[in-house]
Swiss-Prot record:
Gene Ontology cellular-component terms listed: cytosol
GO biological process: gluconeogenesis; glycolytic process
Catalytic reaction annotation: (2R)-3-phosphoglycerate + ATP = (2R)-3-phospho-glyceroyl phosphate + ADP
MF terms in GO: ADP binding; ATP binding; phosphoglycerate kinase activity
Residues the record lists as binding ATP: K204, G298, E329, G358, G359, D360, S361
Homology family: Belongs to the phosphoglycerate kinase family.
InterPro entries in alphabetical order: Phosphoglycerate_kinase (IPR001576), Phosphoglycerate_kinase_CS (IPR015911), Phosphoglycerate_kinase_N (IPR015824), Phosphoglycerate_kinase_sf (IPR036043)
Record flagged with keyword ATP-binding: yes
Swiss-Prot/TrEMBL keywords: ATP-binding, Cytoplasm, Glycolysis, Kinase, Nucleotide-binding, Transferase
Binding of substrate, residues: D20, F21, N22, R35, H58, L59, G60, R61, R117, R154
Protein name listed in UniProt: Phosphoglycerate kinase
Pathway membership: Carbohydrate degradation; glycolysis; pyruvate from D-glyceraldehyde 3-phosphate: step 2/5
Source species of the chain: Bifidobacterium longum (strain NCC 2705)
Length: 401
């Protein structure tokens, strides 16, 4: 994979950087700026080299139309604060305003182009249409840096097709992500523990299949665990259940046994009368995993399982975690996710290599107040880190080879 140093001297050069600024917004307020901060090392390095830094990114799903609420204006403002420099936002991605703002740049300046997904061609399935659009963006720059790890699993105009038109390389964030995820999956120091959560088994099938013969231990929680418990013959009440995945999950349980992979499931769960909605009071109670009442829904792993999961994680040299253990946004159902996060922090402190997969696990870690440096690596890619863990070839990385 080509990296920044492969681009040579960038002084005075216009460098297009595809970043991942898909941040959560509350109106125009950014509620988690982790992805913006993750892009800073690449932006600062390019500025120090005297490059003109032209940033592009998407926000939300405007579906090819201009949606004012999904403008990157809040991102430009936050970036300016973090860099201590003015970051003008172009009104378009490659049109007159973008061209004018780029033409006015001095060495070391930073400009942000408007949301690439305001253009229907960005996500078009028609390769020719995407390529023609990418050429218009590429015309703004003289080199391309791919630094949006959150989109490398997609072949889209601004991260895949642009790379064909300009000298292209991975930015520091993409390089760091690939190094960390490769270190965990290609030659992990053992014991290697994979912790999976989140609501659906169907989202994690590929990861389980790819890691069942690599991991020493698979720890499972979150909504997806009830399909495992049901596959073991337990009743799961009104908990989330994917009936159509039961046979597959039974197969995984058998394969784990056959491969000598330790499969760790919760022994107790926290249940409630239903999914917590609005101001409805919750009445959490702890029950054994094999004794979930018919009218109750499991929403977190119980205290006994929290200790079990924590201890299994600490007894590891490599840990990859993807997906929360429960409905962590509701304090009564956050303890399981906290216990797992604490397990990773404690394992890291005694020398383990730990990765928090992107998406919900990364927001959980931040929202629950854990220090980012308590983990070896927090991935910025939800789907991208999952597909990497599935062993898939990612189009946005392939174009940088």
């Amino acid at each position: 994979m080509k990296t920044l140093k492969d681009l040579g001297d960038l002084k005075g050069k216009r460098v297009l950087v595809r970043a991942d600024f898909n941040v959560p917004l509350d109106g125009t307020t950014i509620t988690d700026d982790g992805r913006i901060k993750a892009a800073l090392p690449t932006i600062k390095t390019l500025r120090e080299e005297g490059a003109k830094v032209i940033l592009m990114a998407h926000l939300g799903r405007p579906k090819g139309k201009v949606v004012p609420e999904l403008s990157l204006a809040p991102v430009a403002a936050r970036l300016g604060e973090l860099l201590g420099a003015n970051v003008p936002l172009a009104k378009d991605t490659y049109g007159e305003d973008a061209q004018a703002k780029v033409a006015a740049m001095n060495d070391g300046d930073v400009v942000l182009l408007e949301n690439v997904r305001f253009n229907p061609e960005e996500t078009s399935k028609d390769a020719d249409e995407r390529a023609a659009y990418a050429k218009k963006i590429a015309a703004l720059g003289e080199a391309f840096v791919s630094d949006g790890f959150g989109v490398v699993h997609r072949a889209q105009g601004s991260n895949y097709d642009v790379a064909a038109d300009l000298p292209a390389a991975a930015g520091l964030l993409v390089e760091k992500e690939v190094k960390a995820l490769s270190k965990a999956t290609e030659n992990p120091e053992r014991p290697f523990t994979v912790v999976l959560g989140g609501s659906k088994v169907s989202d994690k099938l590929g990861v389980i299949e790819n890691l069942l013969d690599k991991a020493n231990r698979l720890v499972i929680g979150g909504g997806m665990v009830f399909t495992f418990l049901k596959a073991k013959g337990y009743e799961v009440g009104t908990s989330l259940l994917e009936e159509d995945q039961l046979e597959k999950v039974k197969g995984y349980i058998e394969t784990a046994e056959k491969n000598g992979v330790e499969l760790v499931l919760p022994t107790d769960v926290v249940v409630n009368a239903g999914f917590p909605a609005g101001d409805t009071p919750v009445a959490p109670e702890v029950v054994a995993a094999d004794a979930i009442p018919a009218d109750k829904m499991g929403l977190d792993i119980g205290p006994e399982s929290q200790k079990l999961f924590h201890d299994k994680i600490v007894d590891s040299k490599t840990v990859v975690w993807n997906g929360p253990m429960g409905v962590f946004e509701v304090p009564e159902f956050a303890a399981g996710t906290k216990a797992v996060a604490q397990g990773l922090v404690d394992a890291t402190a005694v020398g383990a290599f730990t990765i928090v997969g992107g998406g919900d696990s990364a927001s959980a870690v931040r929202n629950l107040g854990f220090p980012e440096d308590g983990f070896s690596h927090i991935s910025t890619g939800g789907g991208a880190s999952l597909e990497f863990l599935e062993g898939k070839e990612l189009p946005g990385l392939k174009v940088l080879e």
